[in-house]
From Swiss-Prot:
The gene is Ciao1. One of its GO terms (biological process) is iron-sulfur cluster assembly. It comes from the Eukaryota. Essential component of the cytosolic iron-sulfur (Fe/S) protein assembly machinery. Required for the maturation of extramitochondrial Fe/S proteins. SMART domains: WD40. HAMAP family: ciao1. This is Probable cytosolic iron-sulfur protein assembly protein Ciao1. It comes from Anopheles gambiae. WD repeats lie at residues 12-51, 58-97, 102-141, 151-190, 197-236, 255-294, 305-341. The keyword Repeat applies. Keywords: Repeat, WD repeat. GO terms for cellular component: cytosolic [4Fe-4S] assembly targeting complex. Belongs to the WD repeat CIA1 family.
Amino acid sequence: MGKLELLQTLTGHAGRVWSAAWHPGGKLFASCGEDKTIRVWNKSDTDRWVAQTVLTDGHTRTIRELAWSCCGHYLASASFDTTVAVWDKKSGEFECNATLEGHDNEVKSVTWSRSGNLLATCSRDKSVWIWEIHHAPDQEDEYECVAVLNGHTQDVKKVCWHPQEDLLASASYDNTIRMYRQDLADSEWEMLEPLESHSSTVWSISFDATGQRLASCSEDTTVKVWQQYGPDNALGIPCPDRGTIWKCVCTLSGYHSRSVYDIDWCKQTGLLATACGDDTVRIFREASDSDRNEPTFELVVTVEAHSQDANKVAWHPTVPGLLLTASDDGEIKLWQYVDAD
């Protein structure tokens, strides 16, 4: 077993906090919510996290999610006002230097590819958009929509890039997860076979450090782990057209009493954190004798982290076990996971 030690509680947002995202360098994080603002936090001289900057002029409605580019120079925000804003500090202060328009309804999620050349967004309009970024010295960056993907039949809740390659995953109200890859022959983005196992809305998804596995969480109160298999795999799982296929290899059920809204797979420790509608954050650890093709995970921490729905969990990119959580209660909390074994 382990425990989560509360390090600090941060307030400042008016209303629910939907999302928080660590800067890839780990020295900053940004948060957003119902109050239409973005707060950028850093550590003070007294080693406490404080709001360094409050960005108020990017959106006219709730900001649902934030994502830093892998280089750390850009911050993207997705809003219910149907737009995505891209912020940078080229001038020394955070400024909105691009507003991406095109979705017909609330934008729910935004994510940068590992290469930094692609941005993906998804919306209540059931579509996933892929944008290509064109950087030119001494000129404004240009964002070009290179694909509109309509594989889902309902509201798309989350988009997430593979950590090593330009493979995109999306999760939806239609109970499925979709994968997308660019066809190198004609540069068109193609939809792969859907991942179907959840019986209700898939709220969030997270790849592990290798990108060989994906975790998903759902309105059906379960967490599922999916494994990627390639041609000639040892189990003999057929892979059409010599491509890869994803299979559900583990279902964690009976642990959550309400919808599971977010999940994050720690790239350092392999721990899985979940944020749930029962106000609770849970941590799962893969068993030491786990079979990769039939993995088993142990619940190692359950903590009533907030007084209302927990919306977000985010592991620190470089400090093992440091966790951010955010909630409908308007608070952001920082925790340290300690392994008691």
